[in-house]
Every structure is written in C-alpha cells, then in structure tokens.
UniProtKB/Swiss-Prot annotation:
Keywords on record: Cytoplasm, Heme biosynthesis, Metal-binding, Oxidoreductase, Porphyrin biosynthesis
Family membership: Belongs to the aerobic coproporphyrinogen-III oxidase family.
Source organism, top-level taxon: Bacteria
Identification of the protein by name: Oxygen-dependent coproporphyrinogen-III oxidase
Site (Important for dimerization) location in chain: 177
Cofactor(s) this protein requires: a divalent metal cation
UniProt subcellular location: Cytoplasm
Gene: hemF
Protein's job: Involved in the heme biosynthesis. Catalyzes the aerobic oxidative decarboxylation of propionate groups of rings A and B of coproporphyrinogen-III to yield the vinyl groups in protoporphyrinogen-IX.
Binding sites annotated in the UniProt record for a divalent metal cation: 98, 108, 147, 177
Taxonomy of the source species: Bacteria, Pseudomonadati, Pseudomonadota, Gammaproteobacteria, Enterobacterales
Length: 308
C-alpha cells in the first residue's frame, strides 16, 4: 500500500484553486478575486478568495484550507471511535458560485482529504468531494452536459462509479423539510480510501479538474440571455433554499462551525441577496413551475440525452 503524500495533495489543491479562479475571472471579464491568507490558532490555515459584484458573477468564493490539530473534536470521533486520540490534518478546496443572471445556475464543488495519525499505527485517511448544480430556470441541454461530464470522468475508474456517486449526491443534497432536491445533483463521494492512495487521489483530481469542464460551457451558453425583475425575484426566492440547506443540513457547514473553523470562509457559500415569501406557489404552466416539474425530481439525465 502506498502511503499518502500530503505535499503532493497540497500542491494539487493550490494549483486547482489558481486554475478555477483564473477561469472564473476570465469569464467574468470585469471583477477580480481578492485573496486573504489566514492562520488557524490550533494549527494550519488557508487561502480564501472571493470575487464580488462582477459582470457575470454576483459572488464567487474559492477556498483552500489546510488545518491540523493534536486531537480531533468529539463531533468527529462520535461515529468513528478509532479516530480518538489521533492527530489529524484536513486539506481541501471548496467553492460556491452565485451568478447575477437567473439563467445561470448556482454551482458548488469540493475536493478534500483527511488523515488521522498515531505513532506506530497505520494512518487512517480518506478522500471526499464532488460537484452539484442548482439551476433556477433549467435547460435540458445543460443538465445533460453536466451529468455527461460527470459520467465521463468516472468511467476510467469503474463502470458503477457514476451511478453510485450520482445517487449519493441526489440523496445528500435533499432538503428534507421542503421535500425537495436542492438542484439537479452531480457527484458526491466520501470515505474513499480503496483500492490504494494513488487511485483515490487520481479520481479526486479527475473530479476537481472536471468541474470547469462541466460548468464553464453552461456559463458561456447562457450568460448573454436577457432577464428582468420577474426572473430575479424567482432567483432570490430559490436562493433561500440554498441557505436553508446549508444552515440546517450540510455536514461540512455544521462541522466547520462546531469545530471553531473560520466562520467567514465557511459562510462564504451564502448568497449575497436572498428573499423568502410566505406560501409561494408558481403559476401553472409558467417558466417557474418547470423547475419543480422537470428539473428537481431525481432523473436519469444520461437517458434524457439519448432521446435527442
């Protein structure tokens, strides 16, 4: 078994952050990312980058963090007693993009690595990550492209991976109190540590690198569409679902806040503007109702693509 190489992972993640920020800034054309390097008292730190009030992106946050500690918090060892008494390191890149246009979907991606070590014992380690898409006004062509990209990057690693990680994503990004999916899903994986380090790292890199391939063509296709107040109002209302999921159900957000993580970085995923409306119902046969009818129910998007 080849042992994890933390320097190798860190180099990849910093490079991924650079690459994604460069692509987003280029697509925006007017705004730039501001960078903040921060240090965590208990160990480690990170590099947070945020772009606000752009021509295309209202807010885009791309975070790198590498935190470490002498012992894991209770919230982390409750489910995994074998981790108690081990020192740990957690590295990752996570991003959330909130475009201006209601015709551009919100997008989220994350790749991460975790290792817990103890002298004279094998380290416990795993990778996790994925990406998911949250449209307001859906386009079938975009949904098919998003899932086809996810399928293609999974294929070299196993025939069943796409369907397994797609289902995991559908199950994870589900807003239970609304009985509704957060978006159209994508990929989600966690606890990945077999068959060996190199294979797991290669797959995680494929997911990280695949994000731009999945998202940027959608941005290029839709960013020039005209929209008005009605579309904006619906976008802001649907962003409320994003906030509800992140603050009530998301494990990463809760873990970060409970373990004294950097609050500004954790809450960078929040949309800058959002609205709630009591008992909102979209009009029958409207463009808004199409989201609920055609996009949020779990769907085999690859099969949808074959019908064209």
């Amino acid at each position: 078994m080849n042992l994890p190489n933390i320097d190798q992972i860190k180099t990849y993640l910093l490079d991924l952050q650079d690459k994604i920020c460069a692509a987003l800034a280029q697509a925006d054309g007017s705004a730039k990312f501001t960078e903040e390097n921060w240090v965590r008292e208990e160990g480690g730190g990170g590099r947070s980058r945020v772009m606000v009030k752009g021509a295309v992106f209202e807010q885009a946050g791309v975070n790198f963090s590498h935190v470490s500690g002498a012992a894991l918090p209770a919230s982390a060892t409750a489910h995994r007693p074998e981790l108690a008494g081990r020192s740990f390191q957690a590295l990752g890149v996570s991003l959330v993009i909130h475009p201006n246009s209601p015709y551009l979907p919100t997008s989220h991606a994350n790749v991460r690595f975790f290792i817990a070590e103890k002298p004279d014992e094998d380290p416990v380690w795993w990778f996790g990550g994925g990406f998911d898409l949250t449209p307001f006004y859906g386009f079938e062509e975009d949904a098919i492209h998003w899932h086809q990209t996810a399928y293609n990057l999974c294929q070299p690693f196993g025939e069943q991976l796409y369907s397994r990680y797609k289902k995991w994503c559908d199950d994870y990004f589900y807003i239970k109190h609304r009985n509704e999916a957060r978006g159209i899903g994508g990929l989600f994986f966690d606890d990945l540590n077999s068959p060996d380090f190199d294979t797991c790292f290669n797959f995680t890199q494929a997911v990280g690198d695949g994000f731009l391939d999945a998202y940027m063509p959608i941005v290029a296709r839709r960013k020039a569409l005209c929209w008005g107040e009605r579309e904006r109002e619906f976008q802001l209302y649907r962003r409320g679902r994003y906030v509800e999921f992140n603050l009530v159900w998301d494990r990463g957000t809760l873990f970060g806040l409970q373990t004294g993580g950097r609050t500004e970085s954790i809450l960078m995923s929040m949309p800058p503007l959002v609205r709630w409306e009591y008992n909102y119902q979209p009009a029958a046969d409207s463009a808004e109702v199409a989201l609920y009818r055609d996009f949020l129910p779990v769907k085999d998007w690859l099969a949808a693509g074959e019908h064209h």
